[in-house]
Swiss-Prot record:
InterPro entries: LS, LS/RS, LS/RS_sf. The active site is at residue 89. Gene3D superfamilies: Lumazine/riboflavin synthase (3.40.50.960). Its EC number is 2.5.1.78. Pathway: Cofactor biosynthesis; riboflavin biosynthesis; riboflavin from 2-hydroxy-3-oxobutyl phosphate and 5-amino-6-(D-ribitylamino)uracil: step 1/2. It is an enzyme of class 2 (transferase). Keywords: Riboflavin biosynthesis, Transferase. Homopentamer. Catalyzes the formation of 6,7-dimethyl-8-ribityllumazine by condensation of 5-amino-6-(D-ribitylamino)uracil with 3,4-dihydroxy-2-butanone 4-phosphate. This is the penultimate step in the biosynthesis of riboflavin. This is 6,7-dimethyl-8-ribityllumazine synthase. GO terms for molecular function: 6,7-dimethyl-8-ribityllumazine synthase activity. (2S)-2-hydroxy-3-oxobutyl phosphate binds at residues 86-87, 128.
Length: 160
């Protein structure tokens, strides 16, 4: 299966009025800066002029900041990259971050778009970073996922 197979089109989203938080790590800055640019573009295209953006050092710091933003925002996007090395550290970090983000979304009923890349190589991360040479833009996809889910929840809550 080729990379990016099955990716849905990012829909036109009218999220004006929603409060969006974005947490992006600074480790692997070229990749994380590109992910952040993709998320910001989706936010702007969706009618959100000023998302709250917080930078943290690494991926392991992302969940606690996402948790705080989830208390005051309609949706949050988590952006970072973890590249496999020669030790089990990769597995611990990836599992902790993924489980933390899922728990936060469920505990707060706030959508969390997971744009934390977990790859075997830097090339794989670059290919998903939304750069001009990338096949995918996981930052944009994570923002679109968080915003569309927030709109879905608002719609459901208005009918309950």
């Amino acid at each position: 299966m080729s990379g990016g197979a099955g990716i849905p089109e990012v829909p036109g989203i009218d999220a004006s009025g929603l409060r969006l938080g974005i947490v992006a790590s600074t480790w692997h800055s070229r990749i994380c800066d590109a992910l952040l640019a993709g998320a910001r573009k989706v936010a702007a295209d969706s009618g959100i002029d000023g998302p709250t953006v917080v930078r943290v050092l690494g991926a392991i710091e992302i969940p606690v900041v996402v948790q705080e933003l989830a208390r005051h925002h309609d949706a949050v996007v988590a952006l970072g990259v973890v590249i496999r090395g020669d030790t089990p550290h990769f597995d611990y970090v990836c599992n902790s971050v993924t489980q933390g983000l899922t728990r936060i979304a469920l505990d707060t009923s706030t959508p969390v778009g997971n744009g934390v890349l977990t790859t075997n190589t830097e090339k794989q991360a670059l290919d998903r970073a939304g750069l001009p040479t990338s096949a995918e833009d996981k930052g944009a996809q994570a923002a679109a996922a968080a915003l569309t889910t927030a709109l879905t929840l608002l719609n459901l809550r208005s009918r309950i």
